[in-house]
Each structure stands twice: as structure tokens, then as C-alpha cells.
Amino acid sequence: MASVQEALAQLLTVDGAMCAALVDSTSGMLLGSAGSGLDLELAAAGNTEVVRAKLKTMKSLGLNDSIDDILITLGTQYHIIRPMAQKEGLFLYLVLDKARSNLA
């Protein structure tokens, strides 16, 4: 089984990848990171709030489902949040340079 750092390094091989992180969504704590371009500790805490807000909204709507991923499109970047199905409470966070990546 690959280590956290090896897995994050593998994510950075995606075209346009700038940085990646593994985040504990119960605490907002950064468990591992790779790459550069953002303050990943700050991003981990902020994106934990995004995940929590979506889960709360889903519960309020009575949606008995799970989040596959959350895509946030900025002017120059894509931010992808992907909860880990096999490890509840953790999510992967990947930042892509929009000009150098392709979501297809």
C-alpha cells in the first residue's frame, strides 16, 4: 500500500496539478501535502467547511446519498475535493492550473 506522500506525489503527475493534500474533515487538519502554490493548511481548514456545509445541506434536504466529489472552478484554477469512500472523514484536495489541465 502506498504511503500518503507517495499517493499525493502520484496526484501531482496529473496534467496541470499544482498541489494536493489529504485532509481530516472532522478536524480540518492537514494530514499530508505535496506541491506548492497555496497555503495548504489554510485550504484544508476552509475546504473542510465546504464539505461540512454540503453534508449539512444534504441532510436538511433528506438526501440519503454521499458526495462523490466537489468541483470549484475559479478563473485560473480548478479545485477538486474528493471524500475517500474507504476512509470516512478524510478527503483528497487537488488544485489544477486551468490553462494546463483538462477535466475530460
Predicted regions and their residues:
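Non-catalytic interaction/Regulatory regions outside core domains
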Residues: 1-104
